[in-house]
């Protein structure tokens, strides 16, 4: 009887392990939250051993976090036939300008960024001590110990330290990029975002820009300078063989960290 019970228990346990896991709707329909300005904050999945050794994941064109915004078409209000040429649905202000004001509007940003930083520090420290004592005399005669050593000393000590450090850094970028308005804030400011990809011989180059602007800073030709963009985040880099050659290899990074 015990043997039959044991066989039944083993069979039941083996059957449970062979059952396939049931995927719940939460797992099947799970999505990641994408920030409108900074991009996808979810952990990037490695595409293979090459990306693992390189220690970085290259951006790709068509990233949903940088996708353009397409505003929904608003339905037109029904208007009765009045026989008049005036239509409320197609009303436009005679004195209105063409500055972007809504989600999906396009604006050109003029990139003109120049930063220069330099720092230097100099230190020169010195210290010296000089102390001496003449031999002691008693009755016009030097006082000596054992007839050989007198009571006198001469001490000299000096310390010198010199340090010099300097650091310089400069960056410059110029060009144009056309972005879109992705959000209109309550105070009227516009949140913009956009990217531009250039495919060259053995790699791609891209420019990404995001930030917040004021409609008053937009010029008459629908452009705005990059130094007028608040919380600006500008990325200019590339992918491909040339970009990989600018970085040290896996072994070089390993020895640099370990040593």
UniProtKB/Swiss-Prot annotation:
<keyword id="KW-0564">Palmitate</keyword>
<protein>
    <recommendedName>
        <fullName>Flagellar L-ring protein</fullName>
    </recommendedName>
</protein>
<feature type="lipid moiety-binding region" description="N-palmitoyl cysteine">
    <location>
        <position position="16"/>
    </location>
</feature>
<dbReference type="GO" id="GO:0003774">
    <property type="term" value="F:cytoskeletal motor activity"/>
</dbReference>
<dbReference type="InterPro" id="IPR000527">
    <property type="entry name" value="Flag_Lring"/>
</dbReference>
<dbReference type="GO" id="GO:0009427">
    <property type="term" value="C:bacterial-type flagellum basal body, distal rod, L ring"/>
</dbReference>
<keyword id="KW-0472">Membrane</keyword>
<keyword id="KW-0998">Cell outer membrane</keyword>
<feature type="lipid moiety-binding region" description="S-diacylglycerol cysteine">
    <location>
        <position position="16"/>
    </location>
</feature>
<keyword id="KW-0449">Lipoprotein</keyword>
<comment type="subunit">
    <text>The basal body constitutes a major portion of the flagellar organelle and consists of four rings (L,P,S, and M) mounted on a central rod.</text>
</comment>
<feature type="signal peptide">
    <location>
        <begin position="1"/>
        <end position="15"/>
    </location>
</feature>
<keyword id="KW-0975">Bacterial flagellum</keyword>
<dbReference type="GO" id="GO:0009279">
    <property type="term" value="C:cell outer membrane"/>
</dbReference>
<comment type="similarity">
    <text>Belongs to the FlgH family.</text>
</comment>
<dbReference type="GO" id="GO:0071973">
    <property type="term" value="P:bacterial-type flagellum-dependent cell motility"/>
</dbReference>
<comment type="function">
    <text>Assembles around the rod to form the L-ring and probably protects the motor/basal body from shearing forces during rotation.</text>
</comment>
<dbReference type="Pfam" id="PF02107">
    <property type="entry name" value="FlgH"/>
</dbReference>
<keyword id="KW-0732">Signal</keyword>
